A protein has these predicted regions:
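N-terminal pre-Walker A segment at the start of P-loop NTPase domains
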Residues: 1-17
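Hydrophobic anchor at the beta1->P-loop junction of P-loop NTPases
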Residues: 24
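Conserved lysine of the Walker
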Residues: 32
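Hydrophobic positions on the alpha1 helix immediately C-terminal to the Walker A/P-loop
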Residues: 35, 39
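Short glycine-rich substrate-engagement loop in P-loop NTPases that contacts/grips substrate
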Residues: 49-80
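Conserved catalytic/switch belt of AAA+ P-loop NTPases
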Residues: 96-117
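Short regulatory helix/loop adjacent to the ATP-binding pocket of P-loop NTPases
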Residues: 123-138, 154-155
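Interdomain hinge/linker elements that couple catalytic modules in large macromolecular machines
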Residues: 144-252
């Protein structure tokens, strides 16, 4: 089992006095949830691990109800400290305002609940953190797996790493490229575009954004002029539109 360096960061920050919310942010399918599972095996403090994936988005009370349950548990069990973990928190409408309210309540009343947030949508996390939680969080970036990690875990060659990338979930399919492409499209690309971009940003030309993504993949690692891209796109509009869409894709 690969132990990523970010695990030590999580452990260290959870051992410190309560000060900031810890936010694990990174691309899909790079092991954020696995890191939390590894952390839980080492943690001696009472924890509550929640996932908002199946919660109805407009159920804003869900976060507050779960949070209050932790407070009640701490009081009944005589706990001086508790770690609350919420995965896919960005799927709850107005999540950041609710988290701010509950976090500030605990701060005012000296309730020692430490908080870890995870999310697969960088756009939604970014919007929520900048809107309501400025000054209250620290970001722990979870990047793609490095070549060293992929080599150790899956015996990747450098050529395989350059071609297939640092996605551990897809690594078992590299000997069947058709299946690998299907997995990448269904598990990573489509959710990133459909859920993280089209559902959170006002995109007037979604077909153009998809074309731009495909061209970006074809020219990965190359420098290419906007004018050249326009010539390969249908209904491309102007270069400022392309620049905005590229920025959105980069943030997703």
């Amino acid at each position: 089992m690969i132990i990523r360096e970010q695990l030590a960061t999580i452990i260290e920050r959870m051992q410190e006095p309560r000060k900031c919310i810890q936010v694990l942010a990174g691309p899909r399918q790079v092991g954020k949830t696995t890191l939390i599972k590894q952390f839980l095996t080492t943690c001696q403090v009472p924890t509550t691990n929640l996932n908002a994936d199946e919660v109805v988005p407009n159920n804003r009370n869900w976060i507050s109800e779960k949070w209050q349950s932790v407070r009640v548990q701490m009081k009944l069990m005589g706990q001086s400290e508790h770690i609350l973990i919420i995965d896919e928190v960005q799927k709850i409408d107005d999540w950041s305002a609710v988290v701010k309210k509950e976090w500030d309540y605990d701060t005012f009343h000296d309730i020692n609940i430490k908080l870890i947030l995870l999310g697969s949508s960088r756009l939604l996390l970014k919007d929520g953190l900048t809107e309501s939680l400025m000054g209250r969080f620290e970001l722990i970036r979870i990047p793609h797996w490095s070549f060293t990690e992929m080599r150790e875990a899956f015996d990747f060659s450098l050529e395989q790493y350059i071609y297939f990338g640092g996605y551990p979930g897809a690594a078992t399919y590299v000997n069947n490229e058709k299946r690998w492409r299907q997995y990448m499209r269904d598990a990573i690309i489509e959710p990133a575009i459909d859920r993280d971009v089209l559902m959170t940003k006002r995109i007037l030309k979604p077909a153009l954004l998809r074309q731009l993504f495909e061209i970006g993949c074809a020219y990965s690692g190359e420098i290419i002029a906007y004018n050249k891209i326009i010539g390969q796109l249908n209904d491309a509009g102007n270069t400022s539109t392309l620049a905005n869409y590229l920025k959105t894709l980069d943030e997703a």
